[in-house]
Amino acid sequence: MAPLGASPRLVLLFSGKRKSGKDFVTERLKSRLGGNICALLRLSGPLKEEYAREHGLDFQRLLDASTYKETYRRDMICWGEQKRQADPGFFCRKIVEGVSQPIWLVSDTRRTSDIQWFQEAYGAVIQTVRVVASEQSRQQRGWVFTPGVDDAESECGLDNFGNFDWVIENHGDEQCLEDQLEHLLGFIQAKL
């Protein structure tokens, strides 16, 4: 059930592998749409905040792309999975509390349970977006395969999801990416 007061016109659920460019794409869309129209939501935000609180860590440092975050990533994944097993909608509910903008971009959807929660809560306004990048492109962005991370559900949970409503190819061709974003922006603006 959707939290009270939350009635978005469109919720885009973004997913993709580490270093595929999910944050880059969603930040770009938000900058074009504006903060009064578009909310950028991260499921990892409340997860990292709660994990930092329970483990006495620096929450702000867990938010950046630092080695600090990478040091705790594997344990944080296991901890988050335990929370989700107890309550699959725990982190989903947290990120939508108090959001008033009509367009929501969820930048880090990682599991079918995340998608199911949003579909049950918001129905027809949900669109799934997969950001894909070649392994070579991801490596150029600093990705290195990490056992226990890149083969965990947090990275592979949507590999066999089926058909996404949108697929954004982010292999490093700026014009190709721009064309895809323009198409998606047209769809979003039609919902306003």
Curated annotation (Swiss-Prot):
Monomer. It holds the Pfam family P-mevalo_kinase. GO terms for cellular component: cytosol. Its main location: cytoplasm. It is found in: Cytoplasm, Cytosol. This is Phosphomevalonate kinase. SUPFAM superfamilies: P-loop containing nucleoside triphosphate hydrolases. GO terms for biological process: cholesterol biosynthetic process; isopentenyl diphosphate biosynthetic process, mevalonate pathway; response to cholesterol. It comes from the Eukaryota. Substrate binds at N170. InterPro entries: P-loop_NTPase, Pmev_kin_anim. Its EC number is 2.7.4.2. GO terms for molecular function: ATP binding; phosphomevalonate kinase activity. The keyword Ribonucleoprotein does not apply. Catalyzes the reversible ATP-dependent phosphorylation of mevalonate 5-phosphate to produce mevalonate diphosphate and ADP, a key step in the mevalonic acid mediated biosynthesis of isopentenyl diphosphate and other polyisoprenoid metabolites. ATP binds at K17, R18, K19, S20, G21, K22, D23, R141, H171, Q180. Pathway: Isoprenoid biosynthesis; isopentenyl diphosphate biosynthesis via mevalonate pathway; isopentenyl diphosphate from (R)-mevalonate: step 2/3. It catalyses: (R)-5-phosphomevalonate + ATP = (R)-5-diphosphomevalonate + ADP.
